[in-house]
Amino acid sequence: MQLTLNGNPRTFERPVVTVADVIRELALEGKRIAVEKNGEIVPRGLYADTPVDSGDRLEIVGAVGGG
């Protein structure tokens, strides 16, 4: 499957069906991240229920602490 991830084309060899699958493939489970799919924020509680299709654009950003 071909997705655009943070502005770069990315091919996933194993099937990814949901946003949760993408996060798992990227080893980001348990990390403090925010996900946007095709310009819409995906609430964390909906990652497993939000489908991804070839050609979708995902932006994934991590939280950065500071002071």
Protein language model regions, located:
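Ubiquitin-like/PB1-type beta-grasp interaction modules and other compact soluble beta-rich domains
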Residues: 1-66
